[in-house]
Amino acid sequence: MLVYQDLLSGDELLSDSFPYKEIQNGVLWEVDGKWVVQGAVDVDIGANPSAEGADADADEGVDDQTVKVVDIVDTFRLQEQPPFDKKQFVTWVKRYIKLLTPKLEGEQQETFKKNIEGATKFLLSKLSDLQFFVGESMGDDTSLVFASYKEGATDPIFIYFAHGLKEVKC
């Protein structure tokens, strides 16, 4: 199994269990998320509680709480952040480029520098529709993960900066 960690914080942000599609000249990865239900599941095993001596109205101590979560957010314990306005986002991108560029090597660094402007413009065009997430450590100087919904979709897509991820074999 491959896990993708944030190069800046070391937080696990993605794994190969979630296939990605390269967009914006490979600078961004798009990953499909899904809403899933977690918690107790009501299973009817065909038993008759009254025949077993149990009170039909009695709570048998089972917590029937179910929660809908997005699989990627839950799996990697992503933490949602407040939305950014254009000025805040541009400030974050500039700081991110400054922090990430020295960690990249040779061709990877050149590709990142060459294509980051287009990727930034792409994200700026969707800014009002994006949700922002960071990894579990919630550091200020880390990669952001962006989520949005395509028109008419019920499940979100997640967008990652590909160059900000380090592949680790587990």
From Swiss-Prot:
GO terms for cellular component: cytoplasm. Keywords: Calcium, Cytoplasm. One of its GO terms (molecular function) is calcium ion binding. It comes from the Eukaryota. It is found in: Cytoplasm. Residues 1-170 form the TCTP domain. Signal peptide: none annotated. It holds the Pfam family TCTP. SUPFAM superfamilies: Mss4-like (SSF51316). Involved in calcium binding and microtubule stabilization. Belongs to the TCTP family. This is Translationally-controlled tumor protein homolog. The gene is TCTP.
